[in-house]
Amino acid sequence: MNAIAIIAASGIGKRMQLPGGRSKQLLEIGGFPVIHHTLKAFEDASQVTEVYIATKADNIDLLQDMARSAGFRKVRHVIEGGKERQDSVWNCIRMISDGHSGAGELPDAILVHDGARPFIRPEEIDDIVRLSVESGACVPGNRPKDTIKYIGSDPSCFGATLERSRLMQVQTPQGFRAGMLIDAHHRAAEEGWYATDDAALVERYFPDYPVRIYETGYHNIKITTPEDIPVAEAIYQALL
């Protein structure tokens, strides 16, 4: 069983309020860039054989040098991302498909992960690969701690309260059988249809394949706002 991982690392951190369009993946946690921790997890995952990174054009050489100096041998390609996250993932998928076009050359699974989620564990990655191959698709998540409400037709008022026991906060890496993800992205590109995560594409184009839930703890956070930095430092220390 083997998988290729796509790391989406093109975000410029608008909500992080970083000057000059600096990438949040390059912020340091525990003395290393966020994306260093991300790449190390996939380097240590036994089921992952290759890693593709989509990033800003200005960061391509920097990330290639970082991977080389850290000894991350699984990093095969660092390419320019697209306008939207989905475009960045599609750029990588096309490269994977072109490079593994022979009969039987596709990996068993493709994983898509946010570059700004540095604390996924290698054993969790391997579990997601296994469940993706078994079920077709597998997405990690955890249960919300807060009550979730709809916003009403009047955006200043709540509309309804959702049943919290039926909700999950979705994370990455999201895993899929390779052919399924490639086909879903290809069809979405043809239609010009965009979603906020890759699982939504598979749900749309492969409705007969329910997406498997893989429940994680609360360590697999995404670095998004300034308040996440001290939380990330605490998680890093706890995981040492």
From Swiss-Prot:
Site for Positions MEP for the nucleophilic attack, residues: R164, K222
Pfam family, one: IspD
Record-annotated site: Transition state stabilizer: R15, K24
A single BP term in Gene Ontology: isopentenyl diphosphate biosynthetic process, methylerythritol 4-phosphate pathway
Catalytic activity: 2-C-methyl-D-erythritol 4-phosphate + CTP + H(+) = 4-CDP-2-C-methyl-D-erythritol + diphosphate
Involved pathway(s): Isoprenoid biosynthesis; isopentenyl diphosphate biosynthesis via DXP pathway; isopentenyl diphosphate from 1-deoxy-D-xylulose 5-phosphate: step 2/6
Keywords: Isoprene biosynthesis, Nucleotidyltransferase, Transferase
General function of this protein: Catalyzes the formation of 4-diphosphocytidyl-2-C-methyl-D-erythritol from CTP and 2-C-methyl-D-erythritol 4-phosphate (MEP).
Protein name (database record): 2-C-methyl-D-erythritol 4-phosphate cytidylyltransferase
Organism: Chlorobium luteolum (strain DSM 273 / BCRC 81028 / 2530)
Gene behind this protein: ispD
